[in-house]
C-alpha cells in the first residue's frame, strides 16, 4: 500500500510537471504531446502512478466537458478534442512513446 501511494504521489507530480510545461511552452499543437508525456511519466512509476494519471486525466476531461457546455452552448465542439486528449492520455499511460504527438519545432527542453 505504501509503495502504491508513493507511486501515486510521484505520478501526480509528473502530471503537474507536464501541465506546467504545457502552460510555459504555450506552443500551438503541443497539448496532445503534453497529455501523453504526463501520463507516460506517471505510469512509469508503477500501478500507483498509472492510477493517478487516469484519475487526473479523467477528472480534467470531465471538467472540460462540463465547462464546454457553457462555452459552446452544448454544441459538442469540445467533444472531439476531448476524445483526442483521452486517446493521447491512454497512449502515454500504455507505455507508448509520447513523442508520437510532439509537434515539429517544440523546444528541446520539453
UniProtKB/Swiss-Prot annotation:
Gene Ontology biological process terms in this record: acute-phase response
Swiss-Prot/TrEMBL keywords: Acute phase, Amyloid, HDL
Basic and acidic residues bias spans: 93-110
Post-translational modification: This protein is the precursor of amyloid protein A, which is formed by the removal of residues from the C-terminal end.
Gene3D superfamilies: Serum amyloid A protein
Organism: Equus caballus
Conditions for induction: Upon cytokine stimulation.
Region (Disordered): 73-110
Name of the protein: Serum amyloid A protein
Superkingdom to which the source organism belongs: Eukaryota
Family per record: Belongs to the SAA family.
Pfam families for this protein: SAA
Amino acid at each position: 500500500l505504501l509503495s502504491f501511494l508513493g507511486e501515486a504521489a510521484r505520478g501526480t507530480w509528473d502530471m503537474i510537471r507536464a501541465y506546467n510545461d504545457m502552460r510555459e511552452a504555450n506552443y500551438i499543437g503541443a497539448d496532445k504531446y503534453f497529455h501523453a508525456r504526463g501520463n507516460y511519466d506517471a505510469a512509469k512509476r508503477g500501478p500507483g502512478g498509472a492510477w493517478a494519471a487516469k484519475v487526473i486525466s479523467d477528472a480534467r476531461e470531465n471538467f472540460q466537458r462540463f465547462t464546454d457546455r457553457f462555452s459552446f452552448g452544448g454544441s459538442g465542439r469540445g467533444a472531439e478534442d476531448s476524445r483526442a486528449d483521452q486517446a493521447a492520455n491512454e497512449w502515454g499511460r500504455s507505455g507508448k512513446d509520447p513523442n508520437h504527438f510532439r509537434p515539429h519545432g517544440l523546444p528541446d527542453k520539453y
